[in-house]
């Protein structure tokens, strides 16, 4: 038992020294991006990096919680009021996006007239090639986007 304790102490000491060396060499520590319950209750929109803009004829609030180092993948929280957005085969959705609806709902009507209702607690993944119409009275959602060339995240 004593040997195990000594081995753990030695291992922990080596790990601490290695971490300290990385820190001294300017290696950036990368952390996961957490969105807390408090954030989701609205405090996230008080962050200094929150972007407020007019989009689709309504006021929107958007906070990016993570941007990948290559600029092609991101996640965040988005709030929008009532609006309608239309996408065509010639000008489709443009990004691969996963959405989790925290509040509100939206209706997705695809180009073939297939209708999907996405409400509180539902999730949907919209492919970049999607064509159709989004109708909503407003929502709060968590989003994750992949954009092959990064242009959809600008």
Which stretches of residues belong to each language-model region?
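Loop/turn positions that initiate beta-strands
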Residues: 121-122
